[in-house]
Amino acid sequence: VSLELGEAAAGAGPGLNEAPEALMQANVDFKQLVEGAGDAIMVCDAMGAITLWNRAAERIFGFGEAEALGQSLDLIIPQRQRQRHWEGYHKTMETGVTRYGADLLRVPALHKDGRTLSIAFTVSMLFSADREVTGIVAIVRDETARFAEERKLRARLVEVEATTIREGDSR
């Protein structure tokens, strides 16, 4: 493909010879951006098959790229969440609109080893040049540790409040 682009650019006039190099550099830059991101970047096609899965997704969910590509999102969606997820997903693919916009969503997810994770993510629709929906991209962060810490802090707050109330009642 690069050779064909080079030949086309060579015959198209001055200044276009740089186009293949610029395109290749943009591709390299994109790959570096995706692979260097600390958050998981996942792309799914209109049917819900995973088409992009970066290193952070591997780290967060435990599935390697080869294990994830081509698979359904059921790979990481807990059983009890699947029906609701797929109803929303298919409606979004049909309409081209996500009801969440740029909202940060928080849901449970599955790790390869069976653990339940707490993840936060945003989604964005993907469209072809003719504005047909081609899929969706999600940027995902593992918030399991933070969520567990918040749970401990809330439990500790309940303990402190209960102790304070008991001490107040005994006076």
Features from the language model and the residues they span:
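Sensory-domain boundary/capping and coupling elements
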Residues: 17-29, 147-165
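Conserved hydrophobic/aromatic "anchor" residues
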Residues: 30, 53, 61-63
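Heptad-repeat register of long alpha-helical coiled-coils used for dimerization/oligomerization
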Residues: 13, 17-20, 24, 31, ...
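Non-catalytic regulatory/interaction regions at protein termini and inter-domain linkers
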Residues: 1-14, 88, 158, 162-171
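Short hydrophobic secondary-structure edge segments in sensory/regulatory modules of signaling proteins
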Residues: 41-42, 50, 171
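PAS-family sensory domains
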Residues: 1-6, 17, 132-142
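PAS/LOV-family and closely related PAS-like sensory domains
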Residues: 50, 56, 65-69, 74-120, ...
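Sensory modules in modular signal-transduction proteins
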Residues: 24-46, 101, 165
